[in-house]
Amino acid sequence: MRKSNPNLVTLIDVLLSESAKNEAPVWKEVAERLAKPRRLQAEVNVSKIEKYAKPNEYVVVPGKVLGSGSITKPVKVAALSFSEKAASKIREAGGVCMKIEELLKENPKGSGVRLMV
C-alpha cells in the first residue's frame, strides 16, 4: 500500500482488524477498495443510491458520493467523502451522512450493510 494520507492508512488498518475480529467480510472489502489508487475508487451518485437502496438501510461507499440525480428514501450513507449537493440531498430526504469510521462503530458486525461502487 502506497497511500500518503495518514488518516486513510489508519482507516484501512482499522477496517482490516475489525473485519478479522468481528468476522465481517464487508469491512475487508471496503478496506481493499480504499487501498486501490484514487482513480479506481468509487464515485456513486445519489440517483444510484435511490435506485438500489431500501429505506432506512445502511449504504457504504468506499469513495465519494456525488449529487447527480435525486433521492427520496431515508438512507444512512457512509462514505469517505460527500459533495455538498449530495450531502444536502440525502439530509433533505431524511437520511444521514456519516464517515465510514462512524458506521464501523455503530455496526461492527457489518450486518445489513449494502456496499455500492
Curated annotation (Swiss-Prot):
GO terms for biological process: translation. This is Large ribosomal subunit protein eL18. The keyword Lipid metabolism does not apply. Keywords: Ribonucleoprotein, Ribosomal protein. One of its GO terms (cellular component) is cytosolic large ribosomal subunit. Belongs to the eukaryotic ribosomal protein eL18 family. It holds the Pfam family Ribosomal_L18. GO terms for molecular function: RNA binding; structural constituent of ribosome. It comes from Archaeoglobus fulgidus (strain ATCC 49558 / DSM 4304 / JCM 9628 / NBRC 100126 / VC-16). PANTHER family: 60S RIBOSOMAL PROTEIN L18, LARGE RIBOSOMAL SUBUNIT PROTEIN EL18.
